[in-house]
Amino acid sequence: MRKFLLLIAVALFSTATYAQLWSTSISAVAEGDKASQNSPAAMDKDGNLYVTGTKTLPIEFAGNEVGGEDAGAYIAKYNAEGVEQYAIELIGSIDITAITTDAENNLYVAGSFAGGAMIQGVTGEPKTISNEELDSKTATFIAKYSAEGELLAVKSYVATLPSLDIWDPVQVSIAKIVAEGSKVYVEFDYTGNVAVEENLSLSAKYISIDWGFMIYCMVTNNASVVSFDSDFTNPTEIATLAVADNADQCSKLFSFNFDVEGENVYVAALGRGNLVLNSEAFDFAFDGQGSTEKGAILSKVGVKSAKISNISNGNDAEFNTISDIEVRDGKLYIAGTFNETCAFDNEIVAVGASDVFVASVDANELTVDWAVANANDEGETNKYYEAVSAVVFGNESVTVFDAVVDMNNNEAPVAKNYTVSYEGVIAETEEAIAATAVVYNANNIAVINYTNETVVTMYDSALTTTAIESVVAEAENNVIYDITGRRVEKITNAGIYIVNGNKVLVK
């Protein structure tokens, strides 16, 4: 039998980088205070950038002093060249949770608030909204602005108890906004009932636990996508995912995300136990010994749905998240994190507490084309985990902005970036850009970092490569395995693969 030597080198690093265009910062919080790490940003089709954040100081912006020393939130606009346009103060105990723009460059902003709040613009009549909970941001609002900052519309929503037997606090927040065509699609995450309008109420599900001497009702996560006209009228409930009636008490929705293409709404979610999407049931099995499946639910709403099961295990999936999804060219691309095994490929096992994954799914059949993971060992599993801060679905590849987070202080001492080609090849970038928020359009990408200052950096969105990323040689009828013993067809981790006859050596 003829023997041969095959050497395959899979890239350890990608030298692809973004070219910086400009950088600036906003001072909005007093020394010793920290800006909200979860404040989102948006970019319109012309490259105008909208940055949000918390504030405890007046903001000097575009030649004006905006706001006072009271706590609040702000929206600041730059043009594509980094020139300050205007800033808006939102008064009250407010956290901005979602933001986007539409084809006409109108701006949509959502946030959570406690007590009373005032939503205002550069122009337009300010709107006062209220929430009975004074100390907890349990209510939410959504506002529409023109590109010039005129306040056009505001709606607010409060969660109420679905049952008198529930003792836990209930809340509602808006996690994502997508403007598509003449409609605005809004993701509501809630644990209590939400009256959207007189003709539409989102009913929260809860789990009843029989303690023998009493029935305890436990709140659960619910997620709904609701479409509105652009002024937040005519709401229609498109998709709702929640635990089933009489669900096992271990049932749980872990993570939910959605995207819109034309009139089609796509949903991707992670969970376990007994779940229902609209009226369709998805049951992840229990073995009676404390172990359960956990997996993914995918749906082209109203057309087709799919359940993708994970292997059974007994651990909670607190690091199972879907950070972002995008539909393009007949594919649904999904990025997030997982612990133990990946729902989109059970042969992919996390190294450490969690890993980053990207998966490609056929947008019509909802079958998985491929899934890859970064296989990064972040350290002690009871101290560090990985979290995705942002995802860029670029022209040539997906870029994932990853952070290694310290569980003890919630700080991220290590930043890592990964590029994933649309063929499923993953590589770590040689120089990582730390980011707490990233937004982009066809030409530009903006990276925002929040500390006691909001630092904004604009880059050209085209990746520049200065060296060879990988060298690949192929041989017919040979199976190649990576350094963890998994087939290369499933995941291409960094390593040197040497095939000599029937033996495979991995360096």
Regions found by a protein language model. Name each.
Residues R2-K3, I496-K507:
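C-terminal tail/sorting-segment detector
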